[in-house]
Amino acid sequence: MKKRIAIVLFNLGGPNSLELVKPFLFNLFYDKAIINLPNPLRYIIAKIISIIRERKSQKIYSLIGGKSSLLQETQEQRLLLTKKLKQLIKEDFAVFINMRYSAPFVKETINQIKKYNPSEIILLPLYPQFSSTTTGSSVKNFLQNLDIPIKTLDIPIKTVCCYPLEEDFIKAHVSLIKEKLYDKNFCILFSAHGLPEKIIKAGDPYSFQIKETVKAIVKELNIKDLDYKITYQSRVGPIEWLKPNTEDEIELAGKLKKDVIIVPISFVSEHVETLVELDIEYKLIADKYEIQYTRIPTLGTNKIFINSLTNILLRFINKVDTNLVTSSSSTRICPNEFTKCLCKLKN
């Protein structure tokens, strides 16, 4: 019997208009994976933050056309992925999108999946490196919202936990970096979205996987004495976040009169953190010191990146295991100390 496969792409989401900035912020900060407090306290805090940050965030989104570009780019990725898969498999399949904090929300996506009536579901996060705050939150939210009809049918659900070392994912980064390399006197800053230190200390493998990705890229670049560093951006509030900060390292490079190449290492789509934070705010720091500032594009619809997603899906489609949760390499990448990882512990 022919399989009928529902593939779900997860991403963060973003406001599709300035009016939707406040509800987007509320949804973000109301997520227990982001603010781990009981209700009604979490609800109150999310309400306060969304009110306080609304106007500032609206000004930021005004700089990029008054809305997030994330959904449009994810739709383009979906179309390319669908086209590629149709060339390679005979099974019936459909690719769905589920944004965590904006439309299409989880219930809308699940209703579409129900109409499609799949024989199995594959969950593919557009977060290469796992975090409990991104992939973990999206997968949990999806599974919690599956209603009784789907649950009682016992449809296999296969989950791609992460793919920080996927071969074509690494090659896609390397190809984009090589296009922009200078001859001399530059440093590469691999800029990832920051997380509070307490989340990492609680067993989240995010920073470990970021390091693994960067290590693989640097090895593939094969540049002798390459000057590079992993940095973190987008910190919010007074608590301790992962360090070093991207803006501080740009400042340091400026003082040393060293040109900067920025690689957005944890983002696979252009959105406010790349288009405003990296392209506008951080570039001003480089301009102050009159150093060259080059920002590598996100992987987006890069052909090699789409190939990497395709290869991951092919592997999972061919697996007979039901309710599988593993990395793209079918093994647990993280040491056992990272207890928030979705994969089973290593033997």
Curated annotation (Swiss-Prot):
Pfam family, one: Ferrochelatase
CDD domains linked: Ferrochelatase_C (cd00419), Ferrochelatase_N (cd03411)
InterPro entries in the record: Ferrochelatase, Ferrochelatase_AS, Ferrochelatase_C, Ferrochelatase_N
Ranges annotated as spanning the membrane: none
Superkingdom in the source lineage: Bacteria
Location(s) in or outside the cell: Cytoplasm
Enzyme class, spelled out: lyase
An example Gene Ontology molecular-function term: ferrochelatase activity
Residues at which Fe cation binds: 193, 273
Reactions mediated catalytically: heme b + 2 H(+) = protoporphyrin IX + Fe(2+)
Keyword Cytoplasm among record annotations: yes
Alphabetized UniProt keyword annotations: Cytoplasm, Heme biosynthesis, Iron, Lyase, Metal-binding, Porphyrin biosynthesis
Function noted in UniProt: Catalyzes the ferrous insertion into protoporphyrin IX.
Record family assignment: Belongs to the ferrochelatase family.
PANTHER family (UniProt xref): FERROCHELATASE, FERROCHELATASE, MITOCHONDRIAL
Protein name per UniProt: Ferrochelatase
Organism: Rickettsia canadensis (strain McKiel)
Gene name of the encoded protein: hemH
